[in-house]
Amino acid sequence: MENVSFSLDRTLWVFLLAMLGSTAGQPLGGESVCTARPLARYSITFTGKWSQTAFPKQYPLFRPPAQWSSLLGAAHSSDYSMWRKNEYVSNGLRDFAERGEAWALMKEIEAAGEKLQSVHAVFSAPAVPSGTGQTSAELEVHPRHSLVSFVVRIVPSPDWFVGIDSLDLCEGGRWKEQVVLDLYPHDAGTDSGFTFSSPNFATIPQDTVTEITASSPSHPANSFYYPRLKSLPPIAKVTFVRLRQSPRAFAPPSLDLASRGNEIVDSLSVPETPLDCEVSLWSSWGLCGGPCGKLGAKSRTRYVRVQPANNGTPCPELEEEAECAPDNCV
């Protein structure tokens, strides 16, 4: 069974937090500097919306069932990039996207904090053991390190993940109070598997990060291929809420109550993605049967490859007959 959660070594995390917290120097780039208050704390809540109703095709039910890896993120300046669409992923992110292994990615974050002084803090949240559910953490941002990036692996999958690339929580002279974003699947470009449970098949040469859509990759075998949809429903969402109190005295703010209410609405309004029936090609015609001198009948069959769901196109007839001249008549 695939290892769906990774163990983050406590000693390394303590070292990382201490090291990165002491390297809040000026960023090397020429980006505009945030003039908000020196520090801000946020709660981050990741909500999985990967349900069988919204994503019925090849939905993983066992070995392992649909779920999410731990969340791994960083608060940083523009000199650091955890991942970026249309660019190649690092070795660390490759390991995370393919196997959920975080060690190499954590070492890359550490190196960026030491050499470039571009990472202010790291944060993580526990894995979600089902396709739908929540996990949360807290993070700290700094005016010179106001960008946030994170990744969560889709489990099971070849190298698919969701995440945010360089979200700026600062807007001019103030910190944003709340940010809610829908998340969609991305392909890390390191494994060529088409389905959730595809065996390991390295992409050589490596490709860049691409967003997976209802029509791309344009192949019926792909687990996210829904040709009737213009776009996929969000597979997850993330909510950032600025915290007004110290972490020890933190109580869920009123915004959290609103978000819980939204979760109830979301659960009642889960999009029903139609899944059309798919059948095989016709078999060869069988032998023609019947008395000599009269018309006989022959038949051929096909079988269901994908059962329809959520009001998708029903399956056509699976057997067909035709008239014929009987075989072996002299």
Swiss-Prot record:
Binding locations of a divalent metal cation: E140
Any GO BP annotation: vascular associated smooth muscle cell proliferation
Entry-linked Pfam families: Spond_N (PF06468), TSP1_spondin (PF19028)
Keyword terms: Calcium, Cell adhesion, Disulfide bond, Extracellular matrix, Glycoprotein, Immunity, Innate immunity, Metal-binding, Secreted, Signal
TSP type-1 domain segment(s): 276-330
Domain Spondin: 30-220
Coiled-coil blocks: none
SUPFAM superfamilies (UniProt xref): TSP-1 type 1 repeat
Keyword RNA-binding: no
SMART domains the UniProt entry points to: TSP1
Disulphide connectivity of cysteines: C34-C170
Tissue: Abundantly expressed in the developing hippocampus.
Residues in the signal sequence: 1-25
Cellular component terms per the entry's GO annotation: extracellular matrix; extracellular space
Claim: Disulfide bond is one of the keywords in the record: yes
Important for metal ion-dependent interaction with integrin, annotated site positions: E140
PANTHER family in alphabetical order: SPONDIN (PTHR11311), SPONDIN-2 (PTHR11311:SF15)
Entry function: Cell adhesion protein that promotes adhesion and outgrowth of hippocampal embryonic neurons. Binds directly to bacteria and their components and functions as an opsonin for macrophage phagocytosis of bacteria. Essential in the initiation of the innate immune response and represents a unique pattern-recognition molecule in the ECM for microbial pathogens.
Self-association state and partner proteins as the record states: Monomer. Interacts with integrin.
Protein name (database record): Spondin-2
Organism: Rattus norvegicus
The gene coding this protein: Spon2
